[in-house]
Regions:
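Flexible hinge motifs at transmembrane-helix junctions and intramembrane kinks/re-entrant loops
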Residues: 1, 20, 178-185, 208-213, ...
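Hydrophobic alpha-helical transmembrane segments of polytopic
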Residues: 66-70, 120-123, 168, 211-222, ...
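Juxtamembrane and boundary regions of transmembrane helices in multi-pass small-molecule transporters
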Residues: 84-88, 103-206, 214
Length: 326
């Protein structure tokens, strides 16, 4: 800012480099990275697929309960998978996509109405709900908290976020699958094929492996520390501790982590965006923008102001292909 530039001892080149790399020291960025490695653990160990198949087996005899199963699967994986692409697209979808062909239901075809259309719609609903319910359910959530902390100085914990969203989340969990079933009712409402197929797949996978049991233990440990240990240990330290234990206990090989492009791309992108947010604050742009917007919205009722801001946010998304960038 102006005061720094006026200081004779100010070294522009040194401070520019320090500022440019500051994002990589953000605890939020490393929390997201750690959660991505958790997601990799679900994939490598096969635990994510096993959870999905288990719920499909016991809830798949009715199409409606199968819809609930899809949402529950996503919610169970969401606390440790901050990428809805990796979670819904990489873990849940490969299981669910095998179900419509069992009933000769195919995309871009009238047969999609049999069951495929409903299941795919539930995939969209499940990823939207699970991404919102947990801070670590989607990278933009964590990035947004970082911005709130940098700009407004407000700290929101993992547990606070979850408890605030929980009432709405429970209502959506109960209503969304049923309402979708009513508005877009599939032609096939009962079947034994889905549960039978999932049971056969589980038999093929065999019993829980050592890596799966280890990952379950690490998941429970991390969740417990995030919820109850926030006063003792930082959330990021919990995530990095879990990653270290996953490596030490051979749940995820180091070579798989180095090849996990999504995690490294997110690390670099989020760190860069954190730096940009900090720069906008220090340069005074945030104060200027807030003042300008408040001038234009002066005289509006609180409800009208919220509507305008939501519309601006909504239509601005057309300019971005990434939620994190948006």
């Amino acid at each position: 800012d102006a005061k720094e530039l006026a200081d004779p001892a100010f070294n522009a080149q040194k401070q520019a480099l320090k500022w440019g790399l500051a994002g990589f020291s953000s605890t939020t960025v490393w929390l997201v990275f750690g959660a991505f490695i958790f997601a990799l653990g679900y994939e490598v160990s096969g635990l994510g697929r096993r959870i999905a198949l288990f719920l499909v087996k016991f809830m798949g005899k009715r199409t409606l309960t199968l819809g609930y199963a899809i949402v529950i699967i996503d919610i169970l994986l969401a606390p440790f998978t901050p990428s809805n692409t990796a979670r819904t697209g990489g873990t849940v979808f490969p299981v669910i996509k095998n179900l419509p062909p069992l009933f000769k239901s195919f995309p871009n075809d009238p047969s999609a109405r049999r069951i495929g259309g409903y299941l795919m719609w539930m995939m969209v609903i499940s990823t939207s709900l699970s991404s919102s319910m947990f801070v670590t359910g989607a990278a933009p959530n964590v990035l947004g908290l970082e911005f709130v902390s940098k700009i407004a100085g407000i700290q929101i914990s993992w547990l606070q976020w979850f408890l605030c969203f929980l009432p709405v989340g429970v209502i959506l969990l109960i209503i969304a699958p049923w309402l979708s079933y009513v508005l877009y009712k599939p032609e096939i409402t009962h079947s034994e094929e889905v549960a039978t197929w999932a049971g056969d797949e589980l038999k093929t996978m065999g019993a829980l492996t050592r890596r799966e049991w280890t990952l379950i233990g690490l998941v429970l440990l991390s969740l417990g520390l995030w919820v109850f240990g926030s006063e003792v240990i930082n959330a990021t330290a919990v995530g990095l501790l879990a990653v270290s234990l996953m490596l030490a206990l051979h749940v995820v090989p180091w070579k798989d982590i180095t090849r996990y492009n999504s995690a490294w791309n997110t690390l670099v992108n989020l760190a860069t965006l954190v730096v940009m947010a900090n720069g906008l604050t220090r340069s005074g742009f945030i104060d200027w923008f807030a003042g300008t917007m408040s001038t234009h919205l002066e005289g509006f009722s609180p409800n009208a102001t919220v509507i305008v801001l939501v519309l601006v946010f909504y239509f601005a998304h057309y300019l971005f292909a990434s939620l994190s960038a948006h």
